[in-house]
Amino acid sequence: MSSEAEAVSSAIQETVTAAPAAVPATKSMSIIVTKGSLDWAYPPFILATTAAAMGLPVTMFFTFYGLPLLLKKLDLKLTAAGNPAMKMPMMGAHMGLPNILTAVPGVDAACSKMMKNLMNKKGVASIEDLRELAIEADVRMIACQMTMDLFEYDLDDMIEGPELGGAATYIECATQADINLFI
């Protein structure tokens, strides 16, 4: 595990230790992961690893655009188009881009690079590290078989650990879970 992942793991453990009450062992969580952009990749992995650190069994179901988060090689990007809440700290203020500028070629690449640099500077773990933490915490990951077929992904393209399953596999899990999230 990288030092970045170890730092995140320690931070999660500290958060869990400081939690006012322990979560009953009978609680569980499921997350449908539908988005695979840089900014949308973080919430499901942060919630999954935190819940797992708190002792909850967690299942993540990766479908449609969330499925590429299970690829061995990630190339995460974000788009500023239509995201008025995306204001980056620059020159002592939080500045956003007018939507018209987001149509300029190269803006998404620049925004992605700026976000990755900011995350690195602030010590935010990479998705690769969070994914590794999830696997180490025994988070159950299900790759949607229909999406694999639809987008012609091969199991060899994916990291080791996730199982293949479909909607019925997820629904079976979700009907038993106390917390169900759609991200």
Report residues per predicted region.
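A charged, amphipathic interaction segment
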Residues: 108-165, 169
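Short, glycine-rich nucleotide/cofactor-binding loops
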Residues: 31-41, 70-71, 118-122
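Glycine-rich loop at the start of a catalytic domain that most often binds anionic cofactors/ligands
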Residues: 70-80
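Histidine-anchored nucleotide/phosphate-binding helix
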Residues: 42-55, 60
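Short internal beta-strands
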Residues: 58-64, 142-144
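Short beta-alpha junction loops
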Residues: 64-68, 148
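Positively charged, low-complexity intrinsically disordered leader regions
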Residues: 2-21
